[in-house]
Amino acid sequence: MAENRRKSENIRRANRVIQTRTFVLMLVLGVAVFLVLALKLYQLQIKQHDYYQSKALDQQTRSTVVTASRGTIYDRNGNELAVSATAETVFLSPKELAEELEKPETKWTKESLSAGLSQLLGVTQESILEQMERTYSQYEVVKLRVDEDTANAVRELLNDNEVHGVYLETDAKRYYPYGSLAAHVIGFVGTDNTGLYGLEAQYEEELQGQTGLVVSAKDNGGNALPYEYEQYYASHNGDDLVLTLDTNVQYYLEKYVKEMADQFEAANGATGIVMDVKTGGVLGMVSYPNYDLNNYSEVSDARLKAAIEDGSASLADQQLRQWRNKALNDTYEPGSTFKILTLSAALEEGVVDMSSTFECSGSITVMGQTIHCSNTSGHGHQTLKEATGNSCNPAFINCGLGLGTDTFYEYMRSFGLLEGSGIDLAGEATGIFMAQSDFSQLDLACYAFGQNFNVTPISLIAAQAACINGGYLYQPHVVEQIRDSSGAVVYQHDNTPLRQVVSQQTSATARECLEYVVSDGGGRNGQVKGYRIGGKTGTADKVKTGDV
C-alpha cells in the first residue's frame, strides 16, 4: 500500500516537472515569437516607415508640381531685361503607362508612342524607351520647356491615341528681350531654370520663387478622384530686381567699346564701366566680346570661333572666355589713370597744392633706377594742372615720394583697392600688390604713376569716383531694389558711403585738374559741348597683352 503511494507520488512529481518544463519551453517560445514579431513591426513601422508610407502615398495619390514664375529683372527705367515666358514641359509616368499597356483596349504600343514623341520633341526614341522602362517611377521628364506649337502637337498625338500617362505641365522659359545687352551683368539660367552666371546666379534665391504642389487622390484603379479630394499648396513667384543700369547708357557704352576694341585689335577684348559717382550705382558695364543671352552656349565672336575651327582652343574654353566679365573678373595695370589717386592723396596730405611746380627733364632716378617720362625729351617747367594734363611721370613720382611708402600704402587701403570693391556680382578678383613690409621707394615711384601692380576695373573706378565726388568711397552695386510679386519693396540699397577718403576741397581741386586734362591736356577729344567734362588718359606698358 505504502509502495503504491510512493509510486503515485513519484509519477505526480514527474508530471509536475514535465509540466513546468513544458510551461518554461512554451514561455520561451512565446517570448521568442513575440520578439521576432516586435522586431519585424519595429522594422516595418519605425525603420521602414518612410519607405512604406511613400509606397502607400504613391499608390493613393498623384502629385503635380505648380511652377513658380521666376522674378523679372528691370533696368532703372522699368525696361524688362529678363522675363519668364510661359512654356510647357512634357513628362511621362512609366508606372501608369505600364498599367495602360495591360489593358486590351489600349491603341498604342511603346514603340509607336516613343516614335511619335521622338519626332515631335527632337529627343531620341531610345532615351524615351529607357524612361518607359522605369516602372518604379511616376515622373520622367521627356523635354523641358517646349513652345506652344510643339505642345499642341503633343496633345494631338496623345488625344488621337487616347494615351494616359504622358502629360504636359505649365513651366516658364527665361527670355532676354534685349539679347546681348548687358549680358555679363544679367547672366543666364540653365535648362533647369536655375541661375548659372551674373545676377541670375548671384540672386538665385530671390529670383527663383517657391514651387507649389497639387496632390490628387486616386482610386484602386489608378483613376483620379474628384477635386474635393485634392490638396493645393500654392506656389510663390520670385522677387523682381530693379537695377541701376540704364539701357541707353549700356547700349552706347557697348557700341563704343566694341569700336575701340576692333580699331586697336584688342585680341583679348575690352571692358568699360559708367558709374554714378554720388551713389556707386553702375549705369553701364561692358565686357567685350559679347554674347546672346538667349543662346548663351553659341560662341558669336569671329576670333573666338576661328580659334575653335583651327583647333587652337576648345568650345568650352571659348564659351568661358565670352562669359567672363572683364570688369571684375580680371585685373590690369591701371597705368596713368591711377594718377588721379596719387594726385588726390598728395593734395590731401599737403604734399602739393595748386601753386606747386615741377621740372621734367624726361626721366627721374630713384634708388639708382632711371624711370622715363612718356615725353622722353621732357615737359620742362609745369604747374600741377599742366603736369596732370601732360600726364608727367616724374611729377607724379615726386608726389608719391612726398607721401612716403606708409602713407601712400594706407591711401591705397582707404580707397578700397586692397580688399576689392564688394560689388553685388559673383567672381570679383582681388588686386595684386606688393606686401607693405616689402614696399620700397622704388616700388612707390612705380606705383605713383600706375605701374607694377594690378587692380580690377570696378575697384579702380570706385576709387576714382571718391576723388571727384567730394571724397566719399561708395560700394559699387547693380541692384538698387528688390520687389516681391505684389510690388512691395523688400530690399532697398543703402547709398550711405563707406567712408570719406579725402576732403571736399581736395576733391574740388582734383576735379579742376581733370577738367584741364580735357580742355587743354591730352584728353581734348573727350570734350562735349555744354558739359563739364573731366578725364585722365592712361596707357600701361603692357599693351602687348591685347587688352584695352
Predicted regions, residues:
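Periplasmic/cell-envelope proteins involved in peptidoglycan metabolism and beta-lactam response
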Residues: 1-302, 331, 406-414, 526-529, ...
